[in-house]
Amino acid sequence: MCSVGASREVILCAGAIHTPRLLLLSGVGPQADLEPLGIDTVIDLPGVGRNLQDHPWIMGLCFESKHPLPAPNYNLAGGAGFWKSRPSLDRPDLMVMPGQVPLVSDEIAARFSIPPNAFVILPCLVRPSSRGYLRLRTADPNGPLEIQPNFLAEQADVEALATCVELGLDLASQPAYRDLVKRWVVPPRRMSREATVAFVRQSCTSYLHPVGTCAMRSDGEAVVDAELRVRGIEGLRIADASVMPTIPSANTNAPSIMIGEFASRLLEAG
């Protein structure tokens, strides 16, 4: 074991999964969860590990191509489209992203025969209402975590993602796709709304954008303040996606970089 001290501050940047994990193992988190594991509570912060958010998506709607598809040079997809699931929304909550490889989840691959010369349209919910959590299952630092994203816990998320699937199929039905699509693979044909909802529940997976588990808030579940300082602990800040109170309506890489830049300015200012 190696002990390292800090003369000024410790900046925790382990991400939305491992930042709360380190805090919990160190006794910073919900006392009710720590005590049964034999972990002494340093400070009772109920919000550590709560408020887990991610982008649920369908990976993906798959179509066999009439023509050979080149391998992507540097990225799966070069663009995305944003829509509203309901006209009354103030901003889009849906994203569809075409990709030039047959990128499908294990769940979909197990149910359909995926041809190699195929492409996908990926429906994604970028403003989910469902919230999850993570917590320790043991005090052993090498032990497993319990991670529960609670995808589709809110019926509104189910309906919105079903609308996004329908939107992706509408896109594949446009004239611009006629010279490209040889046949529909996933799904093989149009579905009723009921069947679309069932397809969403069977096929939903993670976009790998976890955020929010050490959120910057102003209520009882706040973990950090407006300057990224962990509540009740001197000399400890967090600078990663875990501090986001709400998931952005896009990929989380750029916002995470912005948080890092903000942290560097705070440190420079003393």
Spans of features found by a protein language model:
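Glycine-rich loop(s) and the adjacent beta-strand/alpha-helix scaffold that form part
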Residues: M1-P72, A139
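FAD-dependent oxidoreductase catalytic-site/capping-region signature
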Residues: S65-L69, L76-P255, A263-G270
